[in-house]
């Protein structure tokens, strides 16, 4: 939302936004849309592949490997669900042991094959916490016993039993008849005994259901009519869409969390690696799109009360933000990411176009018409030129062949008299508008790391302008002329050089880069092997080698590096320094000096 809408919706995770009209429900409505997607094990095809013999051979091998992986996952998933429905007492006790802890995966470790599944423990824990109502027909008795401190269970359990099942007691309203029968014979000695009572009655219903399935050769949901009302109620505790055991099967990388035992993890990773390697390195493998896929069953979002994931509130259907004026922008169907993207990009949305053109303006002028590119809320500064912002936004979404064309916005800005101004100071203007908010001159902007590196490569004549291809490690390779756009970045451990030049942390969104002036930046340009190599390769250019004399060579260096001819004084200083040097050391130092000038590193 910050990137396209200029809104900090994340502030509404725990409570309604304190400044902007964004309720908590809007945050979780968007969360539900995004949570309904997963990262697939194998990215989808970028486009339909050509039907070649090479591709057909690839597809045959791919189908075999995908089927082996699919069969293995389905087998393990079925075993996991069966385990959750057969070891009910063990999972209930594990969830009981974590009842005062938030349901997070911090405790998840690799387990042995026969251990209970940590993911399923979490699901049982969340499920029980969702059914804490005093009138819950199945679990109300469980929660009355679970509220007794462990050390006092033997002393206080009889009183709890008496209040529900003894003479004069009042059972929880609408308590399931079968649960009542399993618990009413006498007070339990421990929570383990309560868990076993629940497990026993649930297994009885499960056994009855399996008899129906076997007798009808695969019963459909309508066959639940063969169970009585109390049996159907308990059947849903194991088979309902929100039941703890009804863990959805999603073929994404999240599968690893479902199977934490060592053997399954190793085998699953092995098979996944085989599919991935075949899809990337085999001849005939088509390009794939790095994107998410929609879940078959959309995620039903619920409000986290005060942002606490184990205190769930009301259900929230997927929808777009309701703060925008005019008719609400609805998400059609089940609220997919595609519908969300359309709601963001529609011309009915007054924010998107303004946020986009403001970001473009920021890149050209160093400061946006709105100075906070990612915050158009009530706390942001008003635009310096609101009419101009509206004009550019209208042009972006104007009807016609260039509707939505970013190139048209670039063209408008670049051909304007405002952009084509020099960055020369004027005393009267500076006194009236020292921050240049009225744009009486062009702002002088320092090159960021990527354009600075590309400019250094361009001076050598060896900048590689090819488009596409794999990333390259530009920080360790001895020499690589590829544009900095294709540089590899370790998201978890960014290189110190990048942070030195204010490249933001790639893990988090950054509205605008900071600009620092520190000693390591100058030392890099002075001493780093890359910049010395740039100077050497610049001097080795054929046109410089063919220059008739030092004066012509200096003039050509000025043209290559600074885009102009040297002034008479600059030329004389250069000739005085270089003298009649026949070796390249002075020339190397001179080229490095030009590369270190502000004129090279700044855009006027």
For every predicted segment, state its role.
Residues 1, 21, 222-481, 498, ...:
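Primarily short, surface-exposed interaction patches in extracytoplasmic proteins
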Residues 519:
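Active-site-proximal helix/loop microenvironment
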Residues 41-185, 193-247, 251-367, 481-498:
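Short, functional "switch" segments adjacent to catalytic/cofactor/reactive centers
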Residues 1-60, 64, 494, 498, ...:
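Sequence context surrounding c-type heme c attachment/ligation sites in exported
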């Amino acid at each position: 939302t910050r990137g396209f809408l200029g809104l900090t919706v994340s502030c509404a995770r725990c409570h309604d936004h304190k400044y902007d009209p964004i309720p908590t429900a809007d945050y979780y409505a968007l969360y539900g849309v995004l949570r309904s997607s997963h990262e697939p094990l194998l990215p989808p095809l970028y486009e339909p592949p050509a039907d070649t013999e090479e591709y057909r051979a690839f597809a045959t091998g791919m189908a075999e490997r995908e089927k082996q992986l699919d069969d293995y996952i389905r087998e393990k998933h079925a075993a996991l669900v069966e385990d959750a429905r057969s070891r009910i007492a063990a999972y209930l006790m594990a969830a009981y042991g974590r009842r005062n802890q938030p349901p997070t995966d911090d405790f998840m470790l690799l387990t042995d094959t026969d251990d209970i599944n940590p993911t399923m423990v979490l699901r049982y824990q969340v499920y029980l916490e969702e059914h804490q109502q005093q009138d819950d027909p199945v679990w109300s008795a469980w929660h009355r016993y679970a509220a007794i401190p462990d050390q006092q269970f033997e002393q206080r359990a009889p009183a709890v039993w008496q209040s529900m099942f003894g003479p004069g007691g009042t059972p929880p309203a609408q308590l399931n008849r079968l649960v009542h029968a399993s618990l009413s014979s006498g007070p339990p000695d421990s929570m383990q005994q309560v868990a076993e009572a629940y497990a026993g009655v649930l297994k009885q219903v499960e056994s009855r259901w399996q008899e129906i399935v076997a007798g009808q050769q695969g019963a459909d949901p309508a066959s639940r009519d063969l169970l009585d009302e109390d049996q159907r109620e308990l059947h849903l505790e194991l088979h309902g869409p929100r039941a703890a055991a009804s863990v959805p099967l999603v073929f994404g990388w999240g599968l690893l969390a479902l199977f934490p035992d060592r053997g399954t993890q190793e085998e699953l990773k092995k098979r996944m690696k085989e599919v991935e390697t075949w899809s990337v390195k085999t001849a005939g493998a088509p390009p794939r799109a790095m994107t998410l896929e929609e879940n078959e069953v959309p995620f039903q979002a619920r409000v986290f009360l005060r942002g606490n994931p184990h205190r769930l509130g009301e259900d929230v259907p997927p929808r777009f933000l309701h703060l925008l004026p005019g008719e609400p922008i609805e998400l059609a169907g089940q609220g997919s990411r595609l519908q969300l993207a359309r709601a963001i990009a529609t011309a009915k949305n007054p924010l998107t176009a303004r946020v986009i053109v403001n970001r473009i303006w920021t890149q050209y002028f160093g400061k946006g018409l709105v100075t906070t590119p990612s915050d158009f809320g009530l706390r942001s500064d008003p635009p310096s030129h609101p009419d101009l912002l509206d004009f550019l936004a209208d042009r972006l979404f104007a009807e016609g062949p260039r509707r939505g064309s970013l190139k048209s916005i670039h063209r408008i800005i670049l051909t304007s008299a405002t952009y084509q101004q020099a960055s020369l100071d004027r005393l009267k203007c500076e006194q009236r508008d020292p921050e240049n908010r009225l744009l009486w001159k062009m702002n002088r902007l320092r090159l960021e790391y990527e354009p600075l590196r590309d400019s250094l490569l361009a001076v050598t004549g060896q900048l590689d302008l090819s488009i596409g291809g794999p990333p390259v490690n530009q920080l360790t390779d001895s020499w690589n002329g590829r544009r900095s756009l294709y540089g590899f970045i370790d998201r978890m451990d960014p290189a110190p050089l990048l942070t030195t030049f204010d490249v933001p942390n790639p893990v988090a969104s950054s509205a605008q880069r900071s600009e620092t002036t520190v000693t390591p930046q100058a030392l890099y340009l002075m001493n780093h092997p890359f910049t010395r190599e740039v100077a050497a390769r610049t001097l080795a250019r054929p046109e410089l080698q063919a220059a008739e004399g030092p004066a012509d060579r200096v003039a050509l260096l000025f043209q290559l590096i600074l885009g102009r001819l040297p002034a008479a004084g600059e030329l004389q200083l250069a000739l005085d320094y270089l003298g009649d040097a026949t070796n390249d050391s002075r020339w190397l130092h001179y080229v490095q000096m030009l590369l270190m000038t502000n004129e090279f590193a700044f855009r006027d």
